[in-house]
C-alpha cells in the first residue's frame, strides 16, 4: 500500500460560497438538456412488452473530485471506480396503443424518475411515449451512496431501448443519461434537481464486469470481473435520516472548495497510480493495487472529510471503520459516493459485518454482479 499522509495544502483564497438556489435550477421530467450525440440505429417496431433487471452500484472513488464542484450544465468529467451490485431494479415495459400516452403502474415508488427516464429515452428514439411502465426495486436506502436514483433511470431507459431493439448503442446511451440526469427536488414536488452524474450507475448495467473504471464523458476504460471468492458487505448508519435532494445539494455546494482542493492536489497522483498500477493489475485479476488506491483516496486524501456533510459524525465513523483495512480484512474498503454507507469487498464477510454492526450500522450482504442488465421476459 502506498501511504499518503502529506497534509492537504491550503486551497488558496476561499471562493464565495455560491447560492444553491442560483445553481442547479429545477426542471420538469422529460427535459432533454443534451441530445443524443449520435443518431440511433434502425428503430424496429416495439415488442409487446419486455422485462429486465438492472444492477445497482457502489461508487468507490472519483478520479478528479474537483470536476464535480460546480453547476456544469450536467457535464461532469470526474471519472469514478464503481462496483456492480446484484441488488436490482426490475422493470416491466408494455407497449400501448398509438396516442394512449405514458402511464406508470401505481406501485412505482419514484414516479418522477421513471417518467423522466421513459420520456428522454423516447425522445432519443424519436418515438411517442405510448408505454406502460412498472418498476420494483430490491430494498436499498435512498441518498445513502448506492446510486439508487441514477440506476433506476438507467434501468427504465435501457428497458425502453430494449423494447425497440436497442437502437442506441451503450457507448452513446451512457453519456446521454449522465447529461440529462436529475433527482426528485424535495421541496418542489413534480420537478427534478440537476445532480452531478458521472456514469457509474448506467455503466454497471450496460457493460459486463463487477468493477469498472469510468473516465471522462461517461467512457468506460476498464471493465473486469470481481473474483468469485470476494463478496460485498455494506454498512449503513442506523441513525441515517433521509434528506431531500435540494437540502443535500445545498450542503454539498458549501463543500465545493474542499472538492476542488482535493482534485488540484491529488488528481495527478490518482491518474498515475490508476493507469500504471491499479488498471494493469486488475486486468490480471489482482484488485490489490486498486484497493490500495481507493483506501488512500478515501482515508488519506481528504475525500471523507469532503463528504462529511452527508451525515453527522461521518469522519469519526470512518476512523473506526478504518481498522478493517489495517487488519487486512478487506481487499477494498470505501465510503460509497458521498455516503454515508461504507462497504468492504472481502473474503472475510463475517469479520466485516461484525465490525459494521459494532459501529451501530445496519449490515447488507451482496454479491458483485459480473454481467450486464438482463432480459427476464418479453413478448412480441
Question: What residues fall within each predicted segment?
Answer:
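Anion-binding (especially nucleotide phosphate/pyrophosphate-binding) glycine-rich loop
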Residues: 48-49, 86-191
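Intrinsically disordered, low-complexity, positively charged segments
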Residues: 49-85, 90, 97
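Short Gly/Pro-enriched turn/cap motifs at secondary-structure boundaries
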Residues: 80-84, 193-195, 333
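Active-site nucleophile and cofactor-binding loops and adjacent substrate-binding regions
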Residues: 146-148, 195, 204, 335
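Short beta-strand
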Residues: 332-336, 365
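N-terminal pre-core extensions flanking Radical SAM catalytic domains
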Residues: 335-346
Amino acid at each position: 500500500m502506498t501511504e499518503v499522509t502529506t497534509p492537504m495544502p491550503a486551497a488558496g483564497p476561499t471562493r464565495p460560497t455560491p447560492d444553491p438556489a442560483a445553481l442547479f435550477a429545477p426542471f420538469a421530467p422529460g427535459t432533454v438538456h443534451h441530445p443524443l450525440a449520435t443518431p440511433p440505429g434502425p428503430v424496429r417496431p416495439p415488442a409487446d412488452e419486455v422485462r429486465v433487471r438492472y444492477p445497482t452500484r457502489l461508487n468507490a472513488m472519483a478520479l478528479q473530485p474537483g470536476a464535480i464542484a460546480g453547476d456544469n450544465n450536467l457535464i461532469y468529467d470526474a471519472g469514478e471506480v464503481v462496483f456492480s451490485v446484484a441488488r436490482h431494479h426490475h422493470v416491466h415495459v408494455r407497449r400501448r396503443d398509438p396516442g394512449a400516452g405514458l402511464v406508470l403502474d401505481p406501485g412505482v415508488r419514484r414516479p418522477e424518475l421513471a417518467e423522466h427516464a421513459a420520456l428522454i429515452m423516447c425522445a432519443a428514439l424519436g418515438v411517442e411515449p405510448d408505454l406502460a411502465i412498472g418498476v420494483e426495486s430490491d430494498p436499498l436506502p435512498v441518498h445513502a451512496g448506492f446510486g439508487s436514483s441514477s440506476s433506476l433511470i438507467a434501468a427504465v431507459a435501457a428497458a425502453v431501448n430494449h423494447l425497440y431493439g436497442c437502437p442506441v448503442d451503450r457507448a452513446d446511451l451512457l453519456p446521454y443519461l449522465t447529461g440529462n440526469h436529475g433527482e426528485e427536488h424535495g421541496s418542489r414536488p413534480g420537478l427534478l434537481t440537476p445532480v452531478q452524474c458521472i456514469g457509474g450507475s448506467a455503466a454497471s448495467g450496460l457493460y459486463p464486469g463487477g468493477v469498472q473504471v469510468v473516465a471522462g464523458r461517461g467512457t468506460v476504460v476498464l471493465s473486469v470481473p470481481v473474483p468469485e471468492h470476494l463478496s460485498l458487505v455494506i454498512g449503513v448508519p442506523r441513525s441515517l435520516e433521509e434528506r431531500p435532494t435540494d437540502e443535500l445539494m445545498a450542503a454539498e455546494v458549501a463543500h465545493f472548495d474542499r472538492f476542488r482542493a482535493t482534485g488540484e492536489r491529488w488528481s495527478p497522483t490518482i491518474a498515475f497510480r490508476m493507469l500504471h498500477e491499479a488498471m494493469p493489475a486488475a486486468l490480471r485479476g489482482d484488485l490489490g493495487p486498486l484497493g490500495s488506491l481507493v483506501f488512500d483516496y478515501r482515508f488519506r486524501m481528504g475525500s471523507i472529510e469532503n463528504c462529511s456533510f452527508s451525515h453527522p459524525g461521518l469522519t469519526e465513523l470512518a476512523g473506526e471503520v478504518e481498522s478493517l483495512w489495517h487488519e487486512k480484512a478487506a481487499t477494498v474498503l470505501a465510503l460509497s459516493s458521498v455516503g454515508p454507507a461504507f462497504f468492504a469487498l472481502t473474503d472475510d464477510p463475517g469479520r466485516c459485518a461484525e465490525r459494521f454492526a459494532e459501529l451501530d450500522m445496519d449490515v447488507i450482504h451482496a454479491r458483485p454482479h459480473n454481467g450486464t442488465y438482463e432480459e427476464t421476459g418479453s413478448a412480441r
